[in-house]
Amino acid sequence: KLENSLKGAIKAYGTRSLSAMLQALLSNPDSCVLYPECIEIKDKTGMVVDTVTAPRLALAPEELLPKEIELVNLVRKEKSESRKVLCYMTFTGTRDIRPRLQKILEEAGFRVKSLDASVEPKKREAWIAKNTRDADVLLVNPELVKTGLDLYEFPTVVFYQVGYNVFTLRQAARRSWR
């Protein structure tokens, strides 16, 4: 439904809102449980001329998306082998699903920490050393750790969400092994 609405908006208004549409389409599969997708179509002056909305997916509180189930299973397997998991999530702003994933993982019995942008770049390595000593999983946006940090204690890397910046992806992937 969202895809068809966006195609209609492109036909009607051109490509001015492709950036917002791209972000919405990339994040919607993971955030559809939490957020209705609402994309404003703006004209050249910035005036909103239309809005495209996709409804929030109605799940019972205990229901998980298949991707969430797979993450829990992977973390369980890695923990059984004494391996910590570094879980990268691209959309940590207006479509942040870290709180939901942290709750799901904690309810499954894992110790989870989440690094966010409020930790100053020069203090991130110390924050990680101090706060993840007993953690099983670290949730983080790859932009926060793409350069200058060694995350050797997290040998398993999961790109739960992938953006479109290949440089960030490659840099973040190398944090655990260099």
Predicted regions and their residues:
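Conserved Helicase C-terminal RecA-like lobe
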Residues: 1, 7, 11-138, 143-149
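SF2 helicase/translocase ATPase core recognition
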Residues: 1-4, 140-178
